[in-house]
């Protein structure tokens, strides 16, 4: 849409009036409402709209006969048939303008359909690959990270872990790195070069977890993805299908696991309804007898991660303050300087104590991880643990 709008804006004569077109085709129509397409697509649709007859019948101006245009929409979205039924029921003939923040629903309303909408559905009865195994892990919010870590330890290979937000990707990257998991990230805030580099490393690493937002849900073809984890439940069934489609490709087997919190139950039931999974997804079997030990390990890793972030922010603030004083060339008396040096000394001692404690916690975490991997079935309160 952006390229076409650029051409129409350049003054090319035969592109100034598109009202005479007999065919209008939108491919991957569900992607047309993603960020970056709203404005240009709205302009193109406006160029296609035919003038409406005036309300005043006495007006002498005659309008040209309307063009019998056929409109084709191609989409993988599961909601398209339902939207078509609703539009046919309402028989909306006056289009609504497409604005920023538009959804698939408003796009359908923005296009003028002169005749009833017909839907041709080529989708299979199964919406996901036939060799894709689907499962769920029911967990409390406090146990979610521990169950994810246990899953990653039980199932080796390449895994893609999907999150709904970049902040969740960043948090999990720090946590899983402390837990000695080989992790990479792929999210919308990364430059294209960094994304390609991450994908290349992921392809070349046999045992690795790729933390990703939905930027990786479409168009990502990586051979040998063993399983997909929906760490946060996707916002729609379409996204779930696209995410899960990163594994079980080209007739290969694969696994998609959804982590379900109590707050997700409503969305989960809606997802199962749209996937035609009346009885819900089966539970994934994990050695939950190991969960108490894993929770203690993950809890310690969280403490280390939180302390590290606090210290990093304090260090950045101190560096910024020193740079500001230096740039402004602020004078200070000997007394103030002495006070600053005394305070700085106390701060350094406190900082050294925190660093020593942090180092001790990291050693303790490494020992807990080693002992757990050597004997995962040992009880939580044993001396070996």
For each of these PLM feature ranges, what is it?
Residues 13-26, 30-121:
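Post-DEXD/H (motif II) to motif III coupling segment of the RecA-like Helicase ATP-binding lobe
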Residues 147, 158, 167-217:
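Conserved helicase ATPase core of P-loop NTP-dependent helicases/translocases
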Residues 28-32, 169, 215-216, 233, ...:
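Conserved Walker B
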Residues 50, 59-68, 83-87, 92, ...:
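Arginine-glycine-biased low-complexity disordered regions
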Residues 126-178:
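Conserved interdomain hinge at the start of the Helicase C-terminal
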Residues 1-3, 28, 73-78, 123, ...:
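A short beta-strand-to-loop transition that corresponds to the Sensor-1 phosphate-sensing loop
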Residues 1-17:
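Conserved RecA-like ASCE ATPase "motif II neighborhood" in helicase/translocase motors
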Residues 173, 206, 210-228, 242-252:
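SF2 helicase motor core recognition
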């Amino acid at each position: 849409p952006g390229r076409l709008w650029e051409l129409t804006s350049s003054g090319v004569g035969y592109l100034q009036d598109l009202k005479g077109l007999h065919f209008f085709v939108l491919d991957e129509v569900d992607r047309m409402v993603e960020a970056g397409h709203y404005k240009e697509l709205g302009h193109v649709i406006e160029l296609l709209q035919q003038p409406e007859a005036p309300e005043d019948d006495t007006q002498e101006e005659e309008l040209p006969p309307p063009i019998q245009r056929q409109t084709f929409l191609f989409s993988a979205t599961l909601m398209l048939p339902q939207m078509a039924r609703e539009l046919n029921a309402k028989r909306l003939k006056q289009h609504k303008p497409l604005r920023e923040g538009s959804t698939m629903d408003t796009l359908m309303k923005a296009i003028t359909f002169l005749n009833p909408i017909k839907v041709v559905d080529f989708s299979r009865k199964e919406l996901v690959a036939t060799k894709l195994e689907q499962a769920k892990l029911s967990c409390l919010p406090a146990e979610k990270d521990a169950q994810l870590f246990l899953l990653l330890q039980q199932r080796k290979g390449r895994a893609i872990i999907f999150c709904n937000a970049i902040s969740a990707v960043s948090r999990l990257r720090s946590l899983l790195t402390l837990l000695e998991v080989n992790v990479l990230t792929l999210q919308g805030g990364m430059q294209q070069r960094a994304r390609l580099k991450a994908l290349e490393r992921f392809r070349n690493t046999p045992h690795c977890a790729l933390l990703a937002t939905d930027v990786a849900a479409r168009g990502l073809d990586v051979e040998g993805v063993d399983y997909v984890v929906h760490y946060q439940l996707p916002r729609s069934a379409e996204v779930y299908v696209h995410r899960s489609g990163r594994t079980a490709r080209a007739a290969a087997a694969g696994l998609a696991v959804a982590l379900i919190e109590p707050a997700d139950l409503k969305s989960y039931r809606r997802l199962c309804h749209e996937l035609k999974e009346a009885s819900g997804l089966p539970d994934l079997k994990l050695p939950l007898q190991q969960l108490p030990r894993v929770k203690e390990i993950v809890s310690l890793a969280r403490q280390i991660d939180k302390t590290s972030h606090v210290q990093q922010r304090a260090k950045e603030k101190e560096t910024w303050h020193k740079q500001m004083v230096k740039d402004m060339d602020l004078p200070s008396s000997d007394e103030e300087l002495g006070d600053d040096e005394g305070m700085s000394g106390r701060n350094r001692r406190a900082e050294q104590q925190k660093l020593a404690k942090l180092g001790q916690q990291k050693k303790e975490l490494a020992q807990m991880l080693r002992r757990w991997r050597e004997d995962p079935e040992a009880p939580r309160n044993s001396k070996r643990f």
